Curated annotation (Swiss-Prot):
It comes from the Bacteria. Part of the 50S ribosomal subunit; part of the 5S rRNA/L5/L18/L25 subcomplex. Contacts the 5S and 23S rRNAs. Keywords: Ribonucleoprotein, Ribosomal protein, RNA-binding, rRNA-binding. The keyword Ribonucleoprotein applies. GO terms for biological process: translation. GO terms for cellular component: cytosolic large ribosomal subunit. Belongs to the universal ribosomal protein uL18 family. This is Large ribosomal subunit protein uL18. One of its GO terms (molecular function) is 5S rRNA binding. Pfam families: Ribosomal_L18p (PF00861). This is one of the proteins that bind and probably mediate the attachment of the 5S RNA into the large ribosomal subunit, where it forms part of the central protuberance.
Length: 127
């Protein structure tokens, strides 16, 4: 394999494909101080969004379904993703970030990923 990810069967194959796509995406996407990278990490149960300055290697803002403000709220995972998107946008704007580069993390831009991105846009982040 060109990207060094071992191919397996079942769920391991799906995770390897996501990892392979994320490596390919990261070749073209990088966050700077002016436009940091909004990276979304998704599991079966939770979703995490981080605003990262890749030049310095610092996380400027983050939000997750594990945050106490979101945890125990909506039971629908798409609604939780919307809450995470709005919260990460609010925290990013508090850190002085207005525009970001969106990194979907190798996942399809649909469902929870799209819900998070739409909520972040509605909250004022530009991408």
């Amino acid at each position: 394999m060109a990207y060094g990810v071992k191919i397996a069967k079942g769920d391991a194959y799906k995770r390897a494909a996501i990892k392979r796509r994320h490596i390919r995406i990261r070749k073209h996407i990088s966050g700077t101080a002016e436009r940091p990278r909004l990276v979304v990490t998704r599991s079966n149960r939770h979703i995490v969004a981080q605003v990262i300055d890749d030049v310095k290697g610092h996380t400027l803002a983050s939000a997750s379904t594990l945050d106490t403000t979101i945890r125990g709220g909506e039971s629908d995972k798409s609604a939780q993703a919307k809450s995470v998107g709005a919260l990460v946008a609010e925290r990013a704007k508090a850190a002085g970030v207005e525009a970001v580069v969106f990194d979907r993390g190798g996942n399809q831009y649909a469902g929870r990923i799209a819900a998070l991105a739409d909520a972040a846009r509605e909250a004022g982040l530009k991408f």
